[in-house]
Amino acid sequence: MKRAYNFNAGPSALPTEVLEKAQSELLDFENTGMSVMELSHRSKEYENVHHTAAQLLRDLLNIPEDYDVLFLQGGASLQFAMIPLNFLDEGKVANYILTGSWSEKALKEAKFIGKTAIAGSTKESNYTFIPDISSLQYNEHDSYVHLTSNNTIFGTQWHTYPSVSHAPLIVDMSSDILSRPLPVKNFDLIYAGAQKNLGPSGVTVVIIRKELLKRNVDHVPTMLRYQTHAEKQSLYNTPPTFGIYMLKEVLQWLKNIGGTEQIAERNQTKANLIYGAIDESEQFYKGHATKESRSLMNVTFTLPTEELTQQFLSEAKEKGFVGLNGHRSVGGCRASIYNGVPVEACEALADFMHSFYQTHR
């Protein structure tokens, strides 16, 4: 069977090796006579999966001991509410840096909980770039500062993070976690939905500084407290066991190929192929993001006319490319090239883009 060239924005491509491993164990996991989906979450077999996944994440990101790793549910969207519920103090401000639709949604949820502010925004440009760090405006009353590390819809990404000392720095890394080495100690809370770089949908990874868990959250419902899940090692209630198993296998795959430094080189190679096709097209393809803010995960571009865009997408589909439609707020096309997308898929897409350009220039 020929695998599709999968450029979906999420859920997205998974490494073939991981899928094959899951397939081989689907009916009989480690001689239990059961699928991992059938195991009790209190069994020693599942607990080994659970704790191995957490340790692999620690190893790959060099997570310090004063951080907890949590496996939650509800996606990044639930984190948009959990964060202000747990950390937005009365009389203080939740300060958000707006770089796209997902940071807007995070801000919207915080407004239900308390006072908010905008430290910086590039909305006026339709989010074509990441704001200059020196332009960000903080407040002595900030309860925390929040940013989104990569913007899937607009194709922009932070390449240098702001340094924040007056308040906790919280970051949504749903679409670029583990795509490159990460200075975890620079952040107080990192969260990421799994369905782009970590595995299938259904698991949310949270990396949280233990100091934040000491806060009084008696006003927060039990399931929405980070303390609840940290105290029970993410086993307070039934976790998404199969999703965590798949997460473990993706993390093991990443470790086997050399970790974040190796995957960062691979991701740069993939991005260079597609951005190269854009830059060499004499403005036939136009990138949405400015060059200095370009994402290594989501490449966004437009063609001269809507008719050409639809023809491009139609021909691409015939050739086995999936998920290249751009988001309606940007239009055009988008190639999401997360960790699980092989270099060969990006080579094939770049070749197709060159060919289409030569035909229709």
From Swiss-Prot:
Task: Give the cofactor note.
Answer: Binds 1 pyridoxal phosphate per subunit.
* Gene3D superfamilies attached to this UniProt entry: Aspartate Aminotransferase, domain 1, Type I PLP-dependent aspartate aminotransferase-like (Major domain)
List, alphabetically, the InterPro entries matched: Aminotrans_V_dom, Aminotrans_V_PyrdxlP_BS, Pser_aminoTfrase, PyrdxlP-dep_Trfase, PyrdxlP-dep_Trfase_major, PyrdxlP-dep_Trfase_small
Which keywords fit this entry according to its UniProt record?
Answer: Amino-acid biosynthesis, Aminotransferase, Cytoplasm, Pyridoxal phosphate, Serine biosynthesis, Transferase
> Pathway listed for it?
Amino-acid biosynthesis; L-serine biosynthesis; L-serine from 3-phospho-D-glycerate: step 2/3
| Names of the cofactor(s) | pyridoxal 5'-phosphate
EC id: 2.6.1.52
* A biological process from GO: L-serine biosynthetic process
In this chain, pyridoxal 5'-phosphate is annotated as bound at: 76-77, 102, 152, 172, 195, 237-238
Enumerate the catalysed reactions: O-phospho-L-serine + 2-oxoglutarate = 3-phosphooxypyruvate + L-glutamate; 4-(phosphooxy)-L-threonine + 2-oxoglutarate = (R)-3-hydroxy-2-oxo-4-phosphooxybutanoate + L-glutamate
Residues annotated as binding L-glutamate = 42
A Pfam family this chain is assigned to: Aminotran_5
Q: Which residues carry this modification: N6-(pyridoxal phosphate)lysine?
A: 196
Indicate yes or no for the key word Cytoplasm: yes
Q: NCBIfam families, alphabetically? A: PRK05355.1 (NF003764), serC_1 (TIGR01364)
- Name of protein: Phosphoserine aminotransferase
